[in-house]
From Swiss-Prot:
UniProt-annotated binding residues for substrate: 129, 298
Gene Ontology biological process terms in this record: D-alanine biosynthetic process
Protein name: Alanine racemase
NCBIfam families hit by this protein: alr (TIGR00492)
GO molecular function, one term: alanine racemase activity
PANTHER family: ALANINE RACEMASE, ALANINE RACEMASE, CATABOLIC-RELATED
Family: Belongs to the alanine racemase family.
Annotated catalytic residues: 33 (proton acceptor), 250 (proton acceptor)
Length: 352
């Protein structure tokens, strides 16, 4: 069997939730959209079932999957519905929809609901993707408040630059949010992972923990308070020694500078490892760091082995405990979210 493995350490997931909940205070949503950022939404949700105040997803299908698996917690649809007919499933599965544009609002208010719905009303406080502008927010809130079909309203917005503390954008967005919601009763939600960790003023009634929940610092590098949940590993299935000035891989982008031990490992861009990862991207053989050499292929990669490192059959960590996924993402010119969400053709093992 091809030895590409993903370990999901559910104990680390629980640890991270506790840390983030303690920091935020109040209530905390575990964001499990995109199959829990590639970790497996159902397994992660059940691992957090006795801790989490609720879960957040992006689509109706993601919410239904959690409900049909037995999750009874609040489930927030962060993007709301994509067509009016989806409100039927919102009611059937007791989901909490976000409302972030005029047609979502009108469709919700024009529907005859059998039971009142809890609405997350989104403000565009400066990210300019979705949400009502601050100067329109109070009137939209009033329209929802007057409806017999609306149970309660959570006021929320999303930060564009919370992972860039020096930008000043988070403070600008908080000011816009506070002005736009002034005098409007009800719960609030502002803090994403970066704000939970770094912006105390953004910690309102509900937090939304995404990247940090999976043990990854939104600021790059590592955060000793968090434990990585995903570990991607494979094994060396070929080994050879190349003479100096030997090219390796497609495009002959790397030439050895000396006699070099080369290990061939079972992972490539078809598995989700980024093809853009250059030579010198880190990997670890039995816990000892080394590097990728040559271009990443569809199904395999080549790595450098020094004289002291084990070869054929030995484990190679691509990211996890020794290799920080932020380092791999930075080398490849991408972000850790993309790396985790793209993993496929791997065996997943869940460790309690």
């Amino acid at each position: 069997m091809r030895p590409l493995n993903v370990q999901i350490r559910l104990g680390n997931l629980r640890h991270n939730y506790r840390i983030l909940k303690e920091m935020h205070g109040g209530k905390l949503l575990a964001v499990v959209k995109a199959d829990a950022y590639g970790h497996g939404a159902v397994r992660c949700a059940f691992a957090l079932a006795d801790l989490a105040d609720g879960f957040a997803v992006a689509t109706i299908d993601e919410g239904i999957r959690l409900r049909e698996s037995g999750i009874t917690h609040p489930i927030v649809l962060l993007e709301g519905v994509f067509e009016a007919s989806e409100y039927e499933a919102v009611e059937q599965y007791s989901l909490w929809p976000a409302v972030g544009n005029q047609w979502q609002l009108e469709a919700l208010l024009s529907r005859h609901w059998k039971k009142p719905v809890k609405v997350w009303l989104k403000m565009d406080s400066g990210m300019h993707r979705t949400g009502f502008f601050p100067h329109d927010y109070a009137s939209v809130y009033a329209a929802l408040k007057q409806s017999e079909y609306v149970d309660s309203i959570v006021k929320f917005s999303h930060f564009s630059c919370a992972d860039e503390p020096e930008s000043g954008m988070t403070e600008i967005q908080m000011e816009a949010f506070d002005l736009g919601t002034e005098g409007l009763e009800g719960e609030e939600s502002l803090a994403n992972s970066a704000a939970i960790l770094n912006v105390p003023e953004a910690r309102r009634d509900w937090g939304r923990a995404g990247l940090a929940l999976y043990g990854i610092s939104p600021f790059g590098g590592s955060d000793d308070r968090l434990k990585p949940v995903m570990r991607l590993s494979t094994r060396i299935f070929g080994e050879r020694v190349l003479q100096p000035h030997s090219p390796i891989g497609y495009g002959a982008t790397f030439y050895t500078s000396k006699s070099t031990r080369v290990g061939l490992i079972a992972c490539g861009y078809a598995d989700g490892y980024p093809r853009r990862a250059p030579s010198n991207s880190p990997v670890a053989v039995d816990g000892k760091l080394t590097r990728v050499i040559g271009r990443v292929s569809m199904d395999m990669m080549t790595i450098e082995l020094d004289a002291s490192q084990e070869g054929l059959g030995h484990e190679v960590e691509l990211w996890g405990d020794t290799v920080n996924i932020n380092t791999v993402a930075e080398a490849a010119g991408t972000i850790p979210y993309e790396l985790m969400c793209n993993i496929k053709r791997a065996k997943f093992t869940y460790i309690e």
